[in-house]
Amino acid sequence: MQTAIIDYGMGNLHSVLKSVRTAGQLAGKNTKIFLSGDPDRVSRADKVIFPGQGAMPDCMAALTRGGLDEAVKDALKNKPFFGICVGAQLLFDHSEEGNTDGLGWFGGKVRRFARDLRDPQGCRLKVPHMGWNTVRQTQNHPLFQGIPQNTRFYFVHSYYFAPENPETILGESDYPSPFACIVGKDNVFATQFHTEKSHDAGLTMLKNFLNW
């Protein structure tokens, strides 16, 4: 089995690679895990992981420039697919960041947190939302196996998912209001938080993906 981590020059790629390889050892899988910016090699992989970090317009431009956008669209149709952070945001129709069109796998938009964001006590909250936060699993999913409800994951983001179809929401967090932080449809699973930075919980989720 081969698992491709898409390398389009945008993302914490070597951290992702290290985490996925550790997850592969935990899963006991005889799988080749590799970085690739080659559309043909991505198309031959059995599973695909799509990380991303930085501004969505830059990420979309880099993806298209490398000819990887079509490889991603093809993988979304029929391979187990895991989007992480901006890689997950790119799967939506549109983002308010730079008024950027995405790949359109999930209907809906990526919206920015309010600039004057306050908690229930009226204290101002920083944007980006950065640090550990609990995640509520709103539906059952194979990638949640062994992960308790309200487990903490690591976030760094100023924009959040706003899916058209609430049935695609698999997990939520609060900042301070609830927002979707995990979405899924068919063979595709995507998280706003950084799975590769989320210690044991992140490794368990990646292990579950390799077993999916």
From Swiss-Prot:
Family annotation (PROSITE patterns): GATASE_TYPE_1
List the molecular function annotations (GO) for this entry. glutaminase activity; imidazoleglycerol-phosphate synthase activity; lyase activity
Q: What is its main location?
A: cytoplasm
Listed EC numbers: 4.3.2.10, 3.5.1.2
Quote the pathway field: Amino-acid biosynthesis; L-histidine biosynthesis; L-histidine from 5-phospho-alpha-D-ribose 1-diphosphate: step 5/9
Localization per record: Cytoplasm
Catalytically driven reaction(s): 5-[(5-phospho-1-deoxy-D-ribulos-1-ylimino)methylamino]-1-(5-phospho-beta-D-ribosyl)imidazole-4-carboxamide + L-glutamine = D-erythro-1-(imidazol-4-yl)glycerol 3-phosphate + 5-amino-1-(5-phospho-beta-D-ribosyl)imidazole-4-carboxamide + L-glutamate + H(+); L-glutamine + H2O = L-glutamate + NH4(+)
InterPro entries, from UniProt? Answer: Class_I_gatase-like, GATASE, Imidazole-glycPsynth_HisH
Q: What are the catalytic residues? A: 85 (nucleophile), 194, 196
Note the NCBIfam families from the entry.
IMP_synth_hisH
- Described purpose of this protein according to its UniProt entry: IGPS catalyzes the conversion of PRFAR and glutamine to IGP, AICAR and glutamate. The HisH subunit catalyzes the hydrolysis of glutamine to glutamate and ammonia as part of the synthesis of IGP and AICAR. The resulting ammonia molecule is channeled to the active site of HisF.
Designated name of the protein: Imidazole glycerol phosphate synthase subunit HisH
Task: Specify the taxonomic lineage.
Answer: Bacteria, Pseudomonadati, Pseudomonadota, Betaproteobacteria, Neisseriales
Gene from which the chain derives:
hisH
